[in-house]
């Protein structure tokens, strides 16, 4: 690959292209947990995440959500708009699970009365602390108007994807989003949407996401392949 590497992350590498407003994203087979403290290579995982994320972002583009996604290039690569990421992880929860259940003593699997949005400061050295709007303002991560827009878009994305996943027998338990500014200064959805950064349960309650790896529940790629097959079948 002749493109110059800009950034190497836990799950993706980012490369320059001839257009300074566009980057090439290459998905890795690496899977991590505990904020990258534990790593493994699982063959085929990068390809599955790339294809799932491309499918979902294409859908979101078509329903009017502004995203960084341009097109899928290969099984492991896609073109995206270059984005200056806001260092915030925006988590939306529909069902109690994971850290939410532990933090608030809520039984895993309990449906929430309304979707709940949580904000986390994206900072590996601080272990991505849980913060609120006032912290965001103090740290000058985003303006009040930008946070309001991010939350509005997150709820809109949730409403659409929750219905789409339900139509293929999957419950969208929770997910993490990242937003940033493109070359023109527009605030758009970025990063990825895959079973690496969301929780999906099938109608039998089986995990179809990275919890398969975290909890050693079976084959991660088999779970991801099932998600891709179901979404692809409905998209045709």
UniProtKB/Swiss-Prot annotation:
<comment type="similarity">
    <text>Belongs to the SAICAR synthetase family.</text>
</comment>
<protein>
    <recommendedName>
        <fullName>Phosphoribosylaminoimidazole-succinocarboxamide synthase</fullName>
        <ecNumber>6.3.2.6</ecNumber>
    </recommendedName>
</protein>
<dbReference type="GO" id="GO:0005524">
    <property type="term" value="F:ATP binding"/>
</dbReference>
<dbReference type="GO" id="GO:0004639">
    <property type="term" value="F:phosphoribosylaminoimidazolesuccinocarboxamide synthase activity"/>
</dbReference>
<dbReference type="InterPro" id="IPR033934">
    <property type="entry name" value="SAICAR_synt_PurC"/>
</dbReference>
<keyword id="KW-0436">Ligase</keyword>
<keyword id="KW-0547">Nucleotide-binding</keyword>
<keyword id="KW-0067">ATP-binding</keyword>
<dbReference type="Pfam" id="PF01259">
    <property type="entry name" value="SAICAR_synt"/>
</dbReference>
<dbReference type="InterPro" id="IPR018236">
    <property type="entry name" value="SAICAR_synthetase_CS"/>
</dbReference>
<comment type="pathway">
    <text>Purine metabolism; IMP biosynthesis via de novo pathway; 5-amino-1-(5-phospho-D-ribosyl)imidazole-4-carboxamide from 5-amino-1-(5-phospho-D-ribosyl)imidazole-4-carboxylate: step 1/2.</text>
</comment>
<dbReference type="GO" id="GO:0006189">
    <property type="term" value="P:'de novo' IMP biosynthetic process"/>
</dbReference>
<dbReference type="InterPro" id="IPR001636">
    <property type="entry name" value="SAICAR_synth"/>
</dbReference>
<dbReference type="InterPro" id="IPR028923">
    <property type="entry name" value="SAICAR_synt/ADE2_N"/>
</dbReference>
<dbReference type="GO" id="GO:0009236">
    <property type="term" value="P:cobalamin biosynthetic process"/>
</dbReference>
<keyword id="KW-0658">Purine biosynthesis</keyword>
<dbReference type="InterPro" id="IPR050089">
    <property type="entry name" value="SAICAR_synthetase"/>
</dbReference>
